A protein has these predicted regions:
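A residue-level marker of the well-folded mature domains of exported/periplasmic proteins
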Residues: 1-233
Length: 233
């Protein structure tokens, strides 16, 4: 409204690179001026971004600090600092000891892996009495998969105390599993989520803490950056 730009949002039914590529291909065909994407797999999107660039379309990403073939990537904050902070919060809540596991939406998601790398590094440096029980777990940004993977974790690691999520779907999925297994107070879900999604689980104690930024602000900034670049600034 401020600029007169016709900005709109589209999304796929499933969170996967192939769906994102198809959407970008469609936007290229429509000859839009700029495309802004939160990539599931930055490497997989490089060819289609190059195609967009070759067509004269500006390309931007959010949450993809290693993305190539784009005009700019826009980050909300320092991803390492964010990951370390989330570990600090979980560690304090667990009294600096116990077993935990980390989830990512996709193993190819840049920011999710940057957060988890920082979480694990912080734990190893600061909290030696905590233990990561398994490699990071992919839940495909799907709450049902997060729920099922959490049930598997709880069966495999009966001493598990914390589950750290990166995708917004992890906390509610993990918290539901914790609630159903009667483990509130013994196991907690932590990580990136929004109050509108996690409220009930924060209230009943299955989720212990969440961390977030304002997605609307990220969208606003991305649009304004695109607008300024289109004007030649």
């Amino acid at each position: 409204k401020e600029t007169g730009v016709n900005a709109y949002q589209i999304g796929a039914a499933t969170a996967d690179p192939a769906s994102q590529i198809a959407l970008i291909e469609d936007l290229i065909a429509k000859k839009v001026d700029a495309i802004i994407v939160v990539p599931n797999d930055p490497v997989a999107l490089e060819p289609v971004f190059k195609k967009a660039n070759d067509a004269g379309i500006l390309t931007f990403t959010h949450e993809a600090s290693n993305q190539k073939q784009v005009t700019f990537d826009i980050e909300a904050f320092d991803n390492e600092a964010y990951g370390r902070h989330m570990m600090d919060v979980m560690a304090k809540d667990l009294n600096y000891e116990g077993e935990y596991a980390c989830f990512v939406g996709h193993l190819t998601s840049t920011t999710h892996n940057e957060w988890v790398d920082a979480e694990i590094a912080q734990q190893k440096e600061k909290y030696p009495n905590m233990k990561l029980v398994t490699d990071r777990i992919e839940e495909q940004e799907n709450q049902q998969i997060a729920y099922e993977k959490t049930l598997e974790l709880l069966r495999t690691y009966p001493n598990l105390k914390g589950i750290m999520g990166s995708a917004m779907s992890t906390v509610p999925g993990a918290a539901l599993a914790i609630e159903e297994k009667g483990l509130i107070g013994k196991v907690g879900a932590y990580g990136t989520c929004l109050p509108s999604v996690a409220y009930d689980y924060l209230k009943n104690g299955a989720a212990k803490s969440i961390h977030f930024w304002i997605p609307a602000d990220a969208g606003y900034v991305s649009c304004m950056v695109a607008w300024e670049v289109l004007k030649g600034n």
